[in-house]
Amino acid sequence: MTTKDYFLRVRAAEREIRLLDAKKRHYEDMGFSITTKLTGMPGSGQRGVSKVETAAIGMADILSDLKHQYERYSKIVKEAENLISRIPQGKYRQLLTLRYLVGMSWSSISDEMGYKDRNSVYRAHGYALLEAKKVKYGKEN
């Protein structure tokens, strides 16, 4: 795994949480949008598992998955923060934090850190990843 991939795990875990949140909202909508159809015909009622039961079962599963994903996310963030905090150069720590932990765009990072153009921030990012790799693996190259 490259150093960049190591940091991208944070964003991947965030995407998983957003997906689970969307599923949770779907089950909430299912549970709250229950309508009963009365036709007057015998046997016209719904058979089997109701929408409420389906929504409740789905919601319980999603909440369990969300709990596990938040725990995983927290662990990944702590690992990334630990690695970043050990990088000697402050500007590289800031750049990696803004990009991978805060999720800032390249143009926002460039503005925030005073880089004159995107190429400068890309170049600094490359150097920051090299420094992170040195720290992670305890190497000078």
Tell where the protein language model's regions lie, with residue ranges:
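DNA-recognition helix of helix-turn-helix
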Residues: G114-V135
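Short, conserved sequence motifs enriched in acidic/basic residues, glycine, and aromatics
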Residues: R86-I87, Y115
